[in-house]
Amino acid sequence: MASIASSSVADLEKQFLLQNYARYPLVLHRGKGCYVYDTAGKRYLDLIAGIGVNALGYAHPRLTRVIREQAALLLHTSNLYYHEYQGPLAERLAKASGLNRVFFCNSGAEAMEGALKMARSHGRKISPEKIEVIALENSFHGRTFGALSITGQEKYRRDFEPLVPGARFVPRNDIGALEQAAGGKTAAIVCELVQGEGGIYAVTGEYARKARELADRYNALLIFDEIQCGVGRPGTYFSYQRLDPVVLPDVMVAAKPLACGIPLGVIVANEKAAAAIGAGMHGSTFGGGPLACRVALEFFDILDPLLPQIAHIGGYFRMRLNELAKHHGFIREVRGLGLMIGVELEIPGKPIVLDALENGLLLNCTHETVLRMLPPYILTEKDVDRAVSLLNKIFKKAGA
């Protein structure tokens, strides 16, 4: 395979890096649009986009221009001083989300950590015992200690226990279990409205409304994790805006595509939640720097007219995949929202991912049997048709 990692790259990483990643045998060199190219020049249609980060694909001319301009002006200042772009981006996020106040950080996990501190502070102002966080089984919120503590998958947690106390896990969409878990000690209810690492499973509107009701009843914060399922990917700014009626959280965390590859995470909160964090209680050295914020502002300018197209292409992609399922019996289900798509198989997914790599197609497997696709928002019907044609070829081989 022309894309097998060169010995120099692989050997250096084996010698000097922590061995925590199981990388695919591919060394990437450049990208353009929805495609990336390896060091041998082979082209790949990228349906995972840096795990949902590269929302506008690669080498987008408007982002490239902004990055070059800002790099020549100001990269970092710290939060000791103002710069020109944090305020406008915070306003953009507040208006897009329906919330009020923003905190900038560097990643989704860091945003979730800050949201949990917000919930802890909010709860302790009411009672020292109000520290419990209700989270969902099969969820994923990050790999830092707090985020891991509310991640409902044992495989991520077991090597680091005991974790932060107070987490209570309930099954997704089990309203009875949620009602039983909630009470006076509940500081927050946390959920992804579409579980990404968990296999692309959606939370129902009924469940989200019950979570909102219980948070109000017990004066807890409702926190929506939009790190993977939000920021345009569902065809709206955030996934909770697809609910009818919309369920507004107290706190929303987001990251991944916000600055299209430059690290940026956010906590967006209403006034009630934001009041829990005062001066000196939280901070970030790098969070919300001028480069990341300026790129994010440009991204939002590009995203606004793209939202209807995201919904359309996502629907078209799922339709084509469902057509494919009629011809391959091991495809159990196609599910998703916008351009967040899962194809559940009755066979292991990793061999499919490796065969796809061989055929110039990048995708990902989660939960052993779910092919996960988080493509760039600029994906076209032509790209979808190419992907489906390649998958049909790969599935024929797998079913032979």
Kindly give the residue locations of the regions a language model identified.
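Conserved N-terminal phosphate-binding loop of PLP-dependent enzymes in the Aspartate aminotransferase
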Residues: 2-400
